């Protein structure tokens, strides 16, 4: 039996509009690297879409969770945004078995975050900053970003163009002032209107 490695990453932690998506990819790092996976932010949307399909075909397991803004709010109101990632990452690890997981850590102390995941899941976890250098993490980054981008595109059809959804985007700020604000698509816990994000 081969040694299985997994990677976990997220997309959409910082926006005030839309969901956060956390993804796990378990697969051969060499195979994924040959596909050309890298940090999703460094790829064009078209390239991400192509890689997404290739990842689905090449990986042993791919899964993701969509965390809606209301759920993000329940964690942020209590100052527990990192705990949100911890909880959902643990659930994803249970869905895609591997011998070790490389996780892009939201915590300033990656060892603390990795230890917490190991305690919850009973699996070996290596948490790090800038984890996209690990092919499985880069692949998870791409999966999370593609899924989120698709959901955001659907949301824009429903509520209008709100820009990137990030607090620093002038179009997003303008939309928050004057746009249609369905309660379910906005993270009300963000301090964006006061000029900050959590």
From Swiss-Prot:
GO cellular component: cytoplasm; ribonuclease H2 complex
GO BP, one annotated term: mismatch repair
Keyword terms of this UniProt record: Cytoplasm, Endonuclease, Hydrolase, Manganese, Metal-binding, Nuclease
Protein localization: Cytoplasm
Limits of the RNase H type-2 domain: 3-198
Cofactor(s) annotated in UniProt: Mn(2+); Mg(2+)
Cofactor note: Manganese or magnesium. Binds 1 divalent metal ion per monomer in the absence of substrate. May bind a second metal ion after substrate binding.
EC number: 3.1.26.4
Reactions it catalyzes: Endonucleolytic cleavage to 5'-phosphomonoester
Top-tier EC class: hydrolase
Origin superkingdom: Archaea
Binding site for a divalent metal cation: 9-10, 104
GO molecular-function terms, A-Z: manganese ion binding; RNA binding; RNA-DNA hybrid ribonuclease activity
PROSITE patterns recorded: RNASE_H_2
Family: Belongs to the RNase HII family.
UniProt cross-references to HAMAP family, sorted A to Z: RNase_HII_A
Function: Endonuclease that specifically degrades the RNA of RNA-DNA hybrids.
Protein name: Ribonuclease HII
């Amino acid at each position: 039996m081969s040694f299985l490695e997994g990677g976990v990453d997220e997309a959409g932690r910082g926006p005030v509009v839309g969901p956060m998506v956390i993804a796990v990819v378990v697969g051969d790092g060499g195979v994924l690297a040959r596909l050309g996976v890298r940090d999703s932010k460094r790829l064009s949307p078209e390239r991400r879409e192509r890689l997404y399909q290739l990842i689905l075909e090449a990986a042993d397991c791919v899964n993701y969770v969509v965390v809606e803004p209301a759920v993000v709010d329940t964690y942020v109101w209590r100052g527990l945004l990192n705990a949100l990632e911890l909880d959902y990452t643990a659930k994803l690890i249970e869905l895609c078995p591997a011998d070790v997981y490389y996780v892009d850590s939201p915590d300033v102390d990656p060892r603390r975050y990795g230890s917490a995941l190991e305690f919850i899941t009973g699996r070996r976890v290596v948490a790090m900053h800038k984890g996209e250098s690990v092919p499985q993490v880069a692949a998870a980054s791409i999966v999370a970003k593609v899924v989120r981008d698709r959901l955001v595109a659907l949301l824009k059809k429903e509520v209008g163009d709100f820009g990137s959804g990030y607090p620093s985007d002038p179009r997003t700020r303008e939309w928050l002032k004057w746009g249609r604000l369905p309660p379910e698509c906005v993270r009300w816990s963000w301090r964006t209107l006061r000029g900050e994000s959590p």
